[in-house]
């Protein structure tokens, strides 16, 4: 040891170095290099139930070779960046356990727009990566996603740019179904259908579909897609006990004529056709949230009286009101699948259990119509 260092060590008037403590990052739970705090390990990937296909009914989609589960899960609500990820993950995993193989999205689902696709992609990568070929994943484009004239509706530019963005958000190479989300009266139908057909030919989608198209436009869209070599697989209209336009205005007749499948959205009328609103508006319900499409004004005393009457019909069948509503839409021969939303796992399980009930009788159908008091009262 050099003499100077030895002398310094022996001098009591020189300061001594304090004992080293942990690096500040380590004290916060990070590593010694100060990179970041330690995070709890992620949950292990889900292991799907081997009996899942025994629990679900599958229906042929129009005249195609595709079969869809009678109950499909939509990510319109409760899967966005404002919603708890763990709940969203649990619902997706449980749905797959119950034989739900179809997951329906759109570019604007959230909120924030696009975040539902990000959530789905995250769950798919972590929990269900090895099961992609057992799923039908659909997305749509049509509503506003970015500023300017190319951020919505049905132009080729918007649709194909939106599809590419959706694939990036989900980190997928393709979707099974790509929809035009709404009919665009300002764009030639040939252009919109041409974009869908191009998506199929390019391998970014396997099938084309349309949503919320009126009957005449649906028939013409089917003709165009057939001529372009990408037949229309499916139509997604709004349909429930409270919204019967698809059967009253001829859409179901067009779908039957054209051999197009049908998956109905809002079969529970945004959750109104459930036992949640029999006596009021729960704070944690869809109508009780500051965002969403079901507003408190829809839950009137008159509507609650109708819901209670429908609930009596359901109880007599040994079902919940939501299960009755699903059985009602699935009774129609054109309907391939009912697209449900959910905010918790129990709602997914309740919907799947609807398939175990008996077929609706003529007397029960008449009781449902009587409870709703005619067409004017349904809307």
Where are these regions (language model features)?
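C-terminal hydrophobic helical "lid"/dimerization subdomain
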Residues: 2-37
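Short, acidic/polar
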Residues: 82-95, 154-170, 218-222
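Hydrophobic beta-strand scaffold residues
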Residues: 8, 137, 259-262
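N-terminal binding-site loop/beta-alpha segment at the start of enzyme catalytic domains
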Residues: 37-135
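Beta/alpha (TIM)-barrel catalytic core signal, keyed to glycine-rich beta->alpha loops juxtaposed to Asp/Glu
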Residues: 42-55, 183-375, 379
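Active-site groove signature of glycoside hydrolases
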Residues: 167-187
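N-terminal small/glycine-rich loop or linker at the start of catalytic domains
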Residues: 62-80, 138-151, 174, 179
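Alpha-helix N-cap and loop-to-helix initiation/capping positions
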Residues: 83-87, 115, 119, 150-158, ...
């Amino acid at each position: 040891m050099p003499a100077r260092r030895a002398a310094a060590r022996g001098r009591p008037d020189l300061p001594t170095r304090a004992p080293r403590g942990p690096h500040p990052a380590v004290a916060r739970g990070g590593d010694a290099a100060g990179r970041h705090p330690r995070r709890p390990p992620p949950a292990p990937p889900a292991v799907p139930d081997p009996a899942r296909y025994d629990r679900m009914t599958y229906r042929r989609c129009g005249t195609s070779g595709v079969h869809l589960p009678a109950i499909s899960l939509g990510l319109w609500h409760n899967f966005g960046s404002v919603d708890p990820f763990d709940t969203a993950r649990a619902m997706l995993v449980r749905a797959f356990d119950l034989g739900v193989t179809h997951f329906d999205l759109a570019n604007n689902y959230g909120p924030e727009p696009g975040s539902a696709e990000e959530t789905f992609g995250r769950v798919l990568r972590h929990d269900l990566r090895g099961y992609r070929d057992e799923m039908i994943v659909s997305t749509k484009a049509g509503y506003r996603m970015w500023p300017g004239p190319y951020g919505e509706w049905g132009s080729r530019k918007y649709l194909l740019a939106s599809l590419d963005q959706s694939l990036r958000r989900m980190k997928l190479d393709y979707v099974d179904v790509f929809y035009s989300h709404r009919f665009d009266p300002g764009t030639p139908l040939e252009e919109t259908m041409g974009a869908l057909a191009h998506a199929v030919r390019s391998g970014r989608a396997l099938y084309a579909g349309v949503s919320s198209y009126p009957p005449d436009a649906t028939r013409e869209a089917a003709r165009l897609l057939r001529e372009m070599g990408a037949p229309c697989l499916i139509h997604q209209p709004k349909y429930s006990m409270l919204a019967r336009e698809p059967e009253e205005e001829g859409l179901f007749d067009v779908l039957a004529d054209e051999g197009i499948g049908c998956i109905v959205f809002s079969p529970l009328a945004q959750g109104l056709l459930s036992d949640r609103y029999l006596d009021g508006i729960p704070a944690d319900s869809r109508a009780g949230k500051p965002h969403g499409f079901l507003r408190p004004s829809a839950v009137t005393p008159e509507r609650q009286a109708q819901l209670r009457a429908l609930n009596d019909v359901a109880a007599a069948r040994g079902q919940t009101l939501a299960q009755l509503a699903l059985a009602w839409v699935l009774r129609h021969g054109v309907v391939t699948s009912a697209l449900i939303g959910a905010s918790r796992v129990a709602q997914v399980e309740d919907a799947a259990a609807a398939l175990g009930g008996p077929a609706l009788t003529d007397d029960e159908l008449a009781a449902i119509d009587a409870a709703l008091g005619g067409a004017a009262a349904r809307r």
